[in-house]
C-alpha cells in the first residue's frame, strides 16, 4: 500500500496453505582418512561439519519469497528502517473433530495449541525475507504472531515501518 505519493510504509501478503515453522538444521559430520582441505586456512582436517536445512523448510522459504515477489512487487524497505511484523497464522480445521468443536474453532473460540510453535512460524517468514523485503531481520523491532483455525489455512503477513517517537521508553 502506498500512502502520500510513492512513499510505501506498509506491505501485506498472504501465503496460502498450512502454516509451517522453521525446521532445525541437521548437523552432518563427514570423515575422510585422507582429510579435507579448509578453503580459508589451507589446513587439512580428517572431519568436516556441514549444517543442512531441512528440505521442507527450504521449500516453504522459497514459497514465501515467490509470494512476496508476486504480491508486493519486489518492494524493499530502506536498510535503516525499523520494522513491525504482524503475522496471522490460520491452521486448517481438523476433519476428525465434532461439528460443535469445528464451529468453535471457526468462530475463534478454540485456537491452535499445536505445532508449529508461533516463534518458528515467525522465524521462517522473517528469514525468508532477508535481503528481499529488508536488509536483515534484525530490523524487526516489534512483532506479533497470532494463531487461529480456518477452513482456508494460510499465513497473513503485514510489515510496516515503525514511526520514530521522541519520548523515551525504559
Model-derived features: where do they sit?
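Acidic, proline/glycine-enriched N-terminal capping motif
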Residues: 2-170
Amino acid at each position: 500500500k502506498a500512502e502520500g505519493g510513492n512513499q510505501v510504509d506498509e506491505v501485506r501478503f498472504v501465503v496460502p496453505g498450512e502454516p509451517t515453522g522453521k525446521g532445525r538444521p541437521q548437523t552432518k559430520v563427514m570423515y575422510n582418512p585422507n582429510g579435507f582441505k579448509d578453503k580459508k586456512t589451507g589446513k587439512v582436517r580428517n572431519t568436516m561439519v556441514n549444517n543442512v536445512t531441512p528440505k521442507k523448510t527450504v521449500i516453504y522459504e522459497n514459497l514465501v519469497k515467490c509470494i512476496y515477489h508476486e504480491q508486493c512487487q519486489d518492494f524493499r524497505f530502506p536498510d535503516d528502517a525499523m520494522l513491525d511484523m504482524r503475522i496471522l497464522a490460520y491452521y486448517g480445521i481438523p476433519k476428525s473433530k465434532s461439528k460443535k468443536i469445528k464451529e468453535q474453532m471457526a468462530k475463534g473460540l478454540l485456537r491452535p495449541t499445536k505445532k508449529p510453535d508461533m516463534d518458528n512460524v515467525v522465524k521462517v517468514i522473517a528469514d525468508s525475507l532477508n535481503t528481499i523485503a529488508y536488509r536483515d531481520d534484525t530490523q524487526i523491532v516489534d512483532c506479533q504472531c497470532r494463531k487461529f483455525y480456518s477452513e482456508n489455512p494460510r499465513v497473513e503477513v503485514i510489515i510496516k515501518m515503525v514511526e520514530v517517537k521522541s519520548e523515551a521508553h525504559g
